[in-house]
């Protein structure tokens, strides 16, 4: 399946034909006889997708060790994560179990990536109808880490969960946010920082959901000529750093584009939930191997003449 992902095979027949064209090498891959289309179909349906999930998680841990020292261009040593999701459309006729509209089917891939890399650290696959913010209830937040979220995750109760775990968040504020300022911090107009305020949500329900102080930063992005309003809970870091942290969120968008552009997660070799999840997790192992192999060679210690 990894071979099929990386070489864009069109189906199980195409996969079997290509593998059998190199029959002399199949033994080393664990095949004792030519590969049949039915063998691939049976494996796709019967082998639990969690096997590939565990393999991908092991590769995630390995990949992160190689990229841990990457410079994000911020004066921060904290780990910075970005959270987002992407919807993968499916045929309602072939995948009726994934229906989410009257005429459409699809699944949603909720993803958390370490922006150093970027390397995925957590992936959850759900029906496309599930709202993004519900995924936050499943996560264990790392104390001291930053979590970069778009407006779809702006829920004060969930944001309070991040803060109570000792972690930090940076998110876009919704247009209808009502915020009561308690004090203002210095601005930096040349850098784009228009305002920097500390306060609390105005509405009683929102204030009860997030009782601690919040920080609201208004930033003008000269590249897009847009005013952006951020909410965050660290009160000490520079306001410009808050904006730069959020700007790094584009890396998760690039991650999704790379996955959809280079791996097969739109065309599936099976139609069951197990087959779809198997293919997605094997696609993740392919991405992680591509991330690991180049940097692993730079970490090799070559033997000295005496050792040779």
Please give the residue ranges for each predicted region:
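Short coil/turn segments at secondary-structure boundaries
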Residues: 14, 71-74, 257-262, 272
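Conserved, well-structured functional cores that handle cations and Mg-NTP chemistry
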Residues: 1-245
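Short amphipathic alpha-helical "interface-anchor" segments enriched in bulky aromatics
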Residues: 242-270
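Conserved small/polar residues in nucleotide/adenosyl-binding loops
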Residues: 298-304
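Short, catalytically relevant binding-site loops at active-site mouths
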Residues: 176-177, 235-237, 263-266, 275-276
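Small-residue-rich helix-loop
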Residues: 275-284
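Amphipathic alpha-helical core segments of compact helical bundles
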Residues: 286-290, 294
């Amino acid at each position: 399946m990894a071979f099929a992902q990386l070489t864009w095979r069109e189906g199980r027949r195409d996969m079997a034909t290509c593998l059998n064209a190199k029959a002399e090498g199949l033994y080393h891959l664990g095949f004792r006889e030519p590969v049949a289309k039915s063998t691939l179909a049976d494996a796709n349906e019967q082998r639990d997708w969690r096997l590939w999930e565990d393999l991908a998680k092991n590769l995630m841990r390995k990949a992160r060790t190689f990229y841990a020292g990457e410079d994000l261009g911020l004066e921060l040593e904290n780990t910075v994560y970005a959270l987002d999701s992407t919807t993968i459309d499916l045929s309602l006729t072939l995948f009726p179990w994934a229906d989410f509209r009257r005429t459409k089917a699809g699944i949603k891939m909720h993803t958390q990536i370490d922006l150093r890399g970027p390397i995925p650290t957590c992936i959850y696959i759900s029906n496309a109808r599930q709202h993004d913010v519900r995924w936050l209830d499943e996560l264990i937040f790392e104390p001291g880490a930053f979590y970069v979220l778009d407006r779809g995750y702006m829920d004060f109760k969930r944001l309070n969960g991040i803060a109570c775990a000792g972690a930090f968040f940076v998110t876009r504020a919704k247009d209808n946010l009502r915020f009561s300022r308690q004090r203002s911090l210095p601005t930096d107009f040349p850098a784009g920082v228009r305002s920097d305020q500390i306060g609390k949500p105005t509405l009683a329900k929102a204030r009860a959901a997030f009782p601690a102080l919040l920080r609201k930063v208004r930033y003008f992005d000269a590249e897009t000529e847009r005013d952006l309003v951020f909410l965050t809970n660290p009160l000490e870091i520079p306001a410009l750093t808050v904006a730069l942290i959020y700007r790094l969120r584009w890396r998760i968008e690039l991650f999704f584009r790379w996955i959809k552009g280079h791996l097969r997660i739109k065309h599936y070799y099976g139609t069951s939930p197990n087959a779809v999840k198997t293919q997605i997790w094997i696609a993740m192992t392919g991405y992680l191997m591509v991330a690991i192999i180049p940097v692993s060679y730079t970490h090799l210690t070559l033997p000295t003449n005496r050792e040779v």
